Each structure stands twice: as structure tokens, then as C-alpha cells.
Amino acid sequence: MTSDEAKKARFCLHGGPSYEGYSFGAPVSVGGEVVFTTSLVGYPDSMTDPSYKGQILVFTQPLIGNYGVPDGSVRDQYGLLKYMESSKVHVSAIVVAEYAWEYSHWTAVQSLGDWCRKEGVAAIGGIDTRAVVQYLRESGSTMGRVDVEGAAASARVVDPSKVNLVAQVSTKSPFYIPGKPSRVNYDVALVDCGVKENILRCLVVRGVNVTVFPYDYDVCSIAHHFDGVFISNGPGDPIHYRNSTVANLRRLLQDPDLQQVPIFGICMGHQLLALAAGASTVKMKYGNRAHNIPALDLSTGQCHITSQNHGYAVDAATLPRDEFVPLFVNLNDKSNEGIIHVSRPIYSTQFHPEGKGGPMDCSFLFDEYVERMRCYRKLFRQEPFIRFPVIGLPKARVL
């Protein structure tokens, strides 16, 4: 497709302004929650991040598509997707100021527009994204829609915060990814709420064998087979999972035989862990989605630049202070960015320490997690230890 062949399109904000532009994606009309990211690079990573499920993503970077899209099927030496965060695009649509009709990059195999058309994703350019973001910052995240000329109108727009989105992106059955061969390999049970490939990569490169379980799996019943439990990122409102994931995590926290099991949560996993501990979460006005957000480590006083993608936050004032205390705080809006247990090896972060795309300032948190598993195995794990049976399990998410 060329700029001369592009169809007209319209981007409408519910109860707000509408904008005329051009379509460079799939000829479909769709709706969803409108959110924005200020990230300068990494649009393939963002679009395939399960945390964006059901959302219309507005890019503030003025020019999008200039380095094309790499081959999404390429895998690394660990069998993980090398250039994408999952095997499919999860955004409902993308909105950009200017689309780069010509692209150039040594890894690119297709244009962003061609990729969107193949994936059935609406994409609209020629939009004043600066004005859109100013509106969202003042009015808060809202529902919206992208209508493409000649495309059938989409069904009634459904607010993704009202839907169990995690069930749509989580694996349906367990799968197993062996860690990098090391002198010692630790075993982790990962609760899949929509885990990104680079989170898995950050574990396996450190010699961690990862068994991934569905979001509603009773992790408490199998935690004794592992050296640690990990709770992943994911989309939507965490309160939806109070009777499934949160209830399972609460049993895990309360089990007297599992008091020293290391637990690490990221993003949605952070929120679910906080809910299981008895805290509350709140919906943010417009959320934090960027690669350059400063977070203060309250234990050291050091500031880190972090990658973030969330529309909900933990209310730190509701934490049970005899058990959990804040670990990180956002220096822009003072929202909570992490919690840690006062005596047990349990902590979580709202931001993404795996940083893809984005900075790797906080990748040391994965090293700390491995060290906690080393201590747990040496000091607390009961013998004989029976590992969870992984023979015959698939090595990729089952959808």
C-alpha cells in the first residue's frame, strides 16, 4: 500500500473530540480503551505485549514505522521469540501522528502497515496525537474507536476493564522452558497472566527452569515442588481475579509449610500479590506507559529509570504494615512501584525490570530472586525434594 492508496479513517474519543486521518492497517473498524505511550522505540514489542489486550494504543513519537517489523517467528537459543513479546498482536488498534511509508532496518521483513493488515489490526495516521494525549491527561483514559472508510461498523464497544482479559492471554495448560545449563539450575513455577517473552528470557538465561501455569491454577498445591514462585504481568483490572489468582496466592502466603518460598511479581503480578496480602488497588487517571519513568528505591535511596505499562496501581496506604512495606515509589506521580515483605523473601514491582523495550537498570532484581532461591534451597527446602513432572509438557504457551 502507498500513501495514495490509503483509505480515509476517523478516530473518535467517547464523549470527546474526533479526528480525521488515513488508514494504513487492516480495513476494519474497532473500539477499545484509549491509552498512550511516550516510548520512542519498540512498537513491535508494545503491540505484542499481552498487557495491551483490548486497547487502542496512541504513540506520542511523531514518526512510527520507520524501521519496519522483524520476523515474528524467529526464536533464540532458548526457544523464545527473539523480536516479539508474544506470538500475536494484542492491541485493538494503533494511532500515530505520521506513518513512515518507507522503512529500513537490517532485521525488517515487512512494513508496519503490512503487518497490521496481516494481523487484522486497525491503524490510523495523520492524527494530532499531541492533542489526543493532552485530552487524555486532562480527562482520563476513555473508550474510543477507529472507523475505516468502507469497513463495517464494529459491534458495541466493550470496556476491557469489565472483561476477564487474562483468561484470553494466559496459557490453557502448563508448559516448560528449561533454563540455560548451569552448575545449579533452579525451578520456578510461573503464574501466567500474560507473561512477556523477555521475562521468561531473564529467568532462563540465569539458569532457571520455568514451568508456566494458567493464571487460575492452584499454585499453592504445587509450590513445594519448586524453588520459587513468579507472578507475571497481564492486562485488565486485577480485582477480576480475587476469586482465582488472588485466592490462590493468599493460600500460598498463609501456608505454614511455604513461609520461606521466594515470590516475585511484576506489573499485574505485583497488583495480585498486593491484593492477596490484603491491600487495595486503584484505577489511575491515565496510567503510566513509557520507557523513561524514574522510580526511587526506598531501601537504598537510588533512582532508577524504568519501563512501565499499567493503568492500575497498588494503594500503598492499605498495605498491612506488619507484613509488607513499599519498596519503590514513582518520582513523577508518587504512585507505588513495588512492595517487599518485612521478613520473608517476597517482593514485587509495578515496573518492568526486564526492559524490552526500555532500560535494564533494575535487571538486578532477577539476580536477587535467584539468590533468594539459592538460600531457600540450601536452608529451608525439605528433602527428599520431588520436582514437578515436566516430561511431555509443551515448550510454548497453549492458547
From Swiss-Prot:
It is found in: Cytoplasm. It catalyses: hydrogencarbonate + L-glutamine + 2 ATP + H2O = carbamoyl phosphate + L-glutamate + 2 ADP + phosphate + 2 H(+). Pathway: Amino-acid biosynthesis; L-arginine biosynthesis; carbamoyl phosphate from bicarbonate: step 1/1. Its EC number is 6.3.5.5. Its main location: cytoplasm. SUPFAM superfamilies: Carbamoyl phosphate synthetase, small subunit N-terminal domain, Class I glutamine amidotransferase-like. One of its GO terms (molecular function) is carbamoyl-phosphate synthase (glutamine-hydrolyzing) activity. Gene3D superfamilies: 3.40.50.880, Carbamoyl-phosphate synthase small subunit, N-terminal domain. Residues 187-379 form the Glutamine amidotransferase type-1 domain. It is an enzyme of class 6 (ligase). Heterodimer composed of 2 chains; the small (or glutamine) chain promotes the hydrolysis of glutamine to ammonia, which is used by the large (or ammonia) chain to synthesize carbamoyl phosphate. Belongs to the CarA family. This is Carbamoyl phosphate synthase arginine-specific small chain. It comes from Eremothecium gossypii (strain ATCC 10895 / CBS 109.51 / FGSC 9923 / NRRL Y-1056).
